[in-house]
Amino acid sequence: MEQQKKPALYDPSFEHDACGIGAVVNIKGIKTHKTVEDALTIVETLEHRAGKDAEGKTGDGVGIMLQISHRFFKKVTEELGFDIGEEREYGVGMFFFPHDELRKNQAKKMFEIIVAKEGLEFLGWRTVPTNPSVLGQKALDKMPYIMQGFVKKPADVAKGIDFDRKLYIARRVFEQSNDNTYVCSLSSRTIVYK
């Protein structure tokens, strides 16, 4: 009598070359710098999964998604002179603007207008500190001006999915009306650093 083979969970046909992905979580939901450090270690470890140009310094881009650190953003926005309020009462957007001052300022103003038209309140901008010295020449030539924009949750909108839905709509309207700015993320829960 022939024994029937049980199907295995592993199937070699699933194997193929592609970008790598990693995940680091604190199962208790506690936000720590250690989680960020571990995520960056994964990014470094998966370097072989990303594309690079001939010079070996310019990659095809990588990023990490994090929970918004309210304590961090509370501190930096107070230093900038505006109040973001309580946790989940605001959204943070990560924007890649052109370096050209006129185009950058036009895009920023357009976002502020769209936010207001969507019934939200724009709070302020923050320039994100960067370290261009680690970039290859090609990446340096294309490096955007990176800023974060802060948007306040209206009192009549619930925290969570309702507010994030309004942020998503504002983001999509902005993206469709502006072709020189990339929005990495805009949320009250998470932020993407690239």
What are these regions (language model features)?
Residues 1-194:
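N-terminal segments that mediate ammonia production and transfer
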